[in-house]
Amino acid sequence: MAVLIFLGCLLGGIAIGLPIAWALLLCGAALMFWLDMFDVQIMAQTLVNGADSFSLLAIPFFVLAGEIMNAGGLSKRIVDLPMKLVGHKPGGLGYVSVLAAMIMASLSGSAVADTAAVAALLVPMMRSANYPVNRAAGLIASGGIIAPIILPSIPFIIFGVSSGLSISKLFMAGIAPGMMMGATLMLTWWWQASRLNLPRQQKATMQEIWHSFVSGIWALFLPVIIIGGFRSGLFTPTEAGAVAAFYALFVATVIYREMTFATLWHVLIGAAKTTSVVMFLVASAQVSAWLITIAELPMMVSDLLQPLVDSPRLLFIVIMVAILIVGMVMDLTPTVLILTPVLMPLVKEAGIDPIYFGVMFIINCSIGLITPPIGNVLNVISGVAKLKFDDAVRGVFPYVLVLYSLLVVFVFIPDLIILPLKWIN
């Protein structure tokens, strides 16, 4: 009965147009009524406690760092260096988009922000160079979803808080699969570019490459600081977020001098709006998560899937399929917040590596961001590239196919994720 109440309120709330955070609060209130323990004060206290976590402080810092990068000229220079290096290859702008997305992924941690920034810079150039815009937009969107995989990742922070796992280990575990996703996308683009006979850009001189490198070195040094800090144990994810925001602000104002106080004010407002949405969603989900535990929903799911516990591989496949279906119709953050407390006990009982599960969870949900019928990142790229949603879907289809194929490879060869993590550690 608790499952029906939760799903009914969640789907009903979404159907009538409630934001997902309010739909989760509705689920919490309904479960409290059903458990005969409704108390506004308890709900309010749980809501406040849900956002009261030191680890969650990393979110506003990384959001602010991403906003400063876009407004302060860092993103532009990050795109410029790959442009000089590989822009002269056939279909070179496609490789540039993936490389730029991977570099920016190590700075922003947001698929939407990453996609919007790269698309705003490269789509006009691709259109003027007579690239098929739907394929180009599909590639940029597919590169953008690497952002939640490569550190610093906001979804990994939320997953770590929800599951109690080490956020630093999740960050490190995402590096190798994120790079594999980027390599897979570039191979797919190479195959398409060779068939489409795409034009080349003018080859940059060594002087132009050097100038681009010198200009972008300050922006490119930021991921080195973050990864080095984690690897050496110099700072926690929250402290890394603060360092990233301060460093980006320093470079934008002192080195590049492209950010004024007026621009900074707008950046702070934008970061505050984004952070408030994410944090309210996290807090709302904690109310539902607490009541889900009291209603023993994880135990019900565990009992339902208990016959599969003795076959971890089969259980893992079933879980991945369930996440895939949910991820196609729901955004990444609420999917993590809703399913993590339900699935994590079962994963641990089956002896599945929880860090491996966390990485696979986020990869699966990230691909869902470019999978119809919802595809939030598809909506972003459609708006920036001025494409119809249907055209964006057709353009992204081959990349969705290869990314899901890579996900299947990760399911059957978990060492591709586990062994690089052991090497990094």
Segments predicted by a language model, with ranges:
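Alpha-helical transmembrane segments of multi-pass membrane transport proteins
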Residues: 1-425
